[in-house]
Each structure stands twice: as C-alpha cells, then as structure tokens.
C-alpha cells in the first residue's frame, strides 16, 4: 500500500509542484503542506479527542471506580452503567482511528522523501554461500527486490527492481550477476542510453557484510569465496541528492557529524525539529489543568527525540519535511485549543481550574502563550 500511495499519488503531486517552480526544496515544502491539509480533518479529530479526554479523564475515572464498586456483584448492571459513562464522556480510543487511517499516507510520504530523487537508492541482496557439493541439491529460487521509483530527469521516473535469477544461495566458487531492471525486464543501464547525463546514475556495488565471503564487480557480478552469510548492495545515485535549498547544502546529505566535520545544516534542521515539537506539545496543554507527569514528558520527549535524530541517518530532505510538518501541527494545535468545548466538559474544566492549586499551575490558563513574557502587574 505504501508503495502504491507513493508512486500513484505523492510522486505525481511532486512532479506537479516541480513543474511550477523547479526547486526540489520548495517541492518538498509544498507536498508536505498539501498532504497535511488533506489530513487536517483526521488529525484534528485526534487532537480534539486527546484534549477532551485529558479534561474528562479524572471525572470519568472517578465515576467508573464508583460504578465498579457499587455493582461489583452485578456485572451486567456494571457494564450498562459503564456504557452510559462512555457515552457521556466519549470513548478514550476514539482518537486512535483517525490516527491509524492517516498513518499509511504519512509513512508513504516519509518513504518518498527517503528515496529518489532526494537520496541515493540502495538495493540490498542477502546471500548465503554453501559448500559446492551441497548447492547442486538445492532448487534455485529467483530473487527480486522491492521496487523503487528512480528519477533519471526532473519529470521522468520509472520503477526499478534488483533481480538475481539463480537465487540468493551460491556454492563456493560460483558466480552470479545481480541485475537492476524495470518491471518489464529491461536493463536499467539500457534505459539510461540516450539520456543526457545518464552516466551519473550508474549504479555502484559494494559488499556491506561478509567481504571475506564474496566479492562484487562493477557490473554487479558476485563471486562466492567462502561459506557464510553476506550482503551485497547496489546503489543508484539520487537526481537531487546533491541539490541545495536555502541553508541546506544537499537534500540527500546524511549525518550530523561526518568525517570529523559537523554538518551545521543538519544540526539546524534537527534543532528546528526539536523546538517545533516542544512548542506543539506545550500548546496541546494550553488552558488545561497542570499535570506534573505530562509536563515532564512534554519537556523530556523532544530532547530525547532530537538527540536521537542527531545520529540517526536521515537525509536532509526528510528532516526538512519533519520541521515543516511540526510547524503545521503546532498551528493546528493552537487553533483547536481555542475551540469551544461541549457544555459538560467546559463545566468540568471550570471546576478543575477553580481549585487554587490547579488554577495557579494551569498550563497556559491565561491568554498568554507559554513562551510569551508575563504582563507586569499594575
């Protein structure tokens, strides 16, 4: 499903925006905004549900505990009363369905930005080398990899797979060629003939595991040297992997610290992701009673995730998408936090905020945002 969404929905949208303004950086921004706008109703439902459940949860839990205690010996009546409470306050899991529906689209968007044209596309083939006297008894099972759409120009792309007709099991001393080809069986290199600058898409081959067990030549031919498990990788360069955007040196660049040097563009993107995530989480609790555990999680989570992405190998184009998506999410959360609540929930919230301890500790209980300076008292 993810591949279908990427090839038939996201890539055509990407082609459209690149046709309007020939900048892959702007195309990423536009694609992110369009997808987020399309998913707005679903994500808004999740945000509303989370906000309402956070308000209702204390009163809801109190009612549920009372019912369980009162009707402990009458399970049927207990379930009936619990159902009434659920109907009054809403199902805590109701916000999960919109989130689950949009996940395939978000995963497809993520996968699209990790592939061609924004990054080099790897094809991994796991091989098993057996003794030469055993391989004869094994029936060959042809291998084909997952397909990836490869851009060979700004608007021309097609799916490419890796194929090994003799299968992934080789005998010591055997040779086999891994072929990169289209779904119709046409060689990838033959599709490059006649393409201006086509040589820059020539695949490179390497052994990523077990380099003492197999070796691979420039045309993808593998020779088995010794028994064991090995992995061979073929990599097709991304068309826009070296294209820059604003302060980003290359959209396909990976890594915060590479070859002894800090990539400051990656550092800025990761820092921007952490900051926008923090703002979004602060806004999600605006005007609600303080929850010490939630407040601590809101502060720690962005720091942990940001630290992880400093060393997680994500291309700059993917990080750009994540920052733009977080900005959109923060704006959406701010707007929804100003929506009127149902009468019963508003009454519960007013009661919660009327308590001195909660009122003084409420997160964003006033109109002032958490990051705005306090007004001076007269």
Swiss-Prot record:
A UniProt-annotated Pfam family: 60KD_IMP
Keyword line: Cell inner membrane, Cell membrane, Chaperone, Membrane, Protein transport, Transmembrane, Transmembrane helix, Transport
GO molecular function: membrane insertase activity
Compartments (UniProt record): Cell inner membrane
GO BP annotations, alphabetical order: protein insertion into membrane; protein transport
Membrane topology note: Multi-pass membrane protein
Membrane-spanning residues: 20-42, 93-113, 264-284, 304-324
Main location: membrane
One of the record's GO cellular component terms: plasma membrane
CDD domains registered for this protein in UniProt: 5TM_YidC_Alb3
Family: Belongs to the OXA1/ALB3/YidC family. Type 1 subfamily.
Subunit structure: Interacts with the Sec translocase complex via SecD. Specifically interacts with transmembrane segments of nascent integral membrane proteins during membrane integration.
Role of this protein: Required for the insertion and/or proper folding and/or complex formation of integral membrane proteins into the membrane. Involved in integration of membrane proteins that insert both dependently and independently of the Sec translocase complex, as well as at least some lipoproteins. Aids folding of multispanning membrane proteins. Probably also aids protein insertion, folding and/or assembly of membrane complexes destined for the thylakoid.
UniProt-recorded name of the protein: Membrane protein insertase YidC
Species of provenance: Prochlorococcus marinus (strain MIT 9313)
Organism lineage: Bacteria, Bacillati, Cyanobacteriota, Cyanophyceae, Synechococcales
């Amino acid at each position: 499903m993810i591949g279908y969404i990427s090839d038939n929905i996201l890539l055509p949208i990407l082609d459209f925006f690149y046709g309007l303004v020939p900048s892959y950086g702007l195309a990423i921004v536009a694609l992110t905004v369009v997808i987020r706008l399309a998913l707005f109703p679903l994500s808004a439902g999740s945000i509303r549900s989370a906000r309402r459940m956070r308000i209702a949860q204390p009163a809801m839990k109190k009612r549920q505990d009372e019912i369980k205690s009162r009707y402990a010996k009458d399970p049927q009546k207990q379930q009936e009363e619990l159902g009434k409470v659920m109907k009054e306050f809403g199902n805590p899991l109701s916000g999960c369905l919109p989130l689950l529906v949009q996940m395939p689209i978000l995963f497809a968007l993520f996968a699209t930005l990790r592939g061609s044209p924004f990054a080099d596309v790897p094809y991994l083939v796991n091989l098993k080398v057996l003794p030469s006297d055993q391989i004869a008894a094994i029936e060959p099972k042809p291998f084909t990899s997952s397909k990836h759409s490869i851009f060979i120009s700004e608007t021309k792309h097609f799916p490419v797979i890796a194929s090994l007709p003799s299968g992934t099991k080789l005998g010591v001393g055997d040779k086999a060629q891994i072929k990169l080809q289209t779904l119709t069986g046409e060689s990838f290199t033959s599709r490059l003939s006649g393409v201006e600058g086509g040589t820059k898409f020539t695949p490179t081959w390497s052994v990523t595991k077990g380099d003492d067990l197999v070796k691979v030549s420039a045309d993808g031919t593998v020779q088995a040297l010794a028994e064991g498990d090995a992995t061979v990788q073929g990599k097709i360069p991304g068309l826009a992997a070296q294209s820059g955007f604003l302060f980003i040196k290359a959209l396909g660049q990976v890594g915060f610290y590479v070859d002894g040097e800090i990539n400051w563009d990656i550092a800025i993107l990761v820092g921007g992701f952490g900051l926008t995530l923090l703002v979004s989480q602060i806004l999600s609790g605006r005007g609600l009673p303080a929850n010490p555990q939630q407040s601590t999680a809101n502060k720690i989570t962005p720091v942990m995730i940001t630290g992880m992405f400093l060393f997680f190998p994500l291309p700059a184009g993917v990080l750009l998408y994540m920052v733009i998506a977080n900005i959109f999410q923060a704006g959406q959360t701010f707007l929804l936090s100003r929506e009127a609540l149902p009468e019963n929930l508003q009454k519960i919230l007013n009661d919660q905020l009327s308590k001195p301890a909660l009122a003084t500790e409420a997160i964003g209980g006033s109109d002032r945002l958490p990051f705005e300076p306090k007004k001076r008292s007269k």
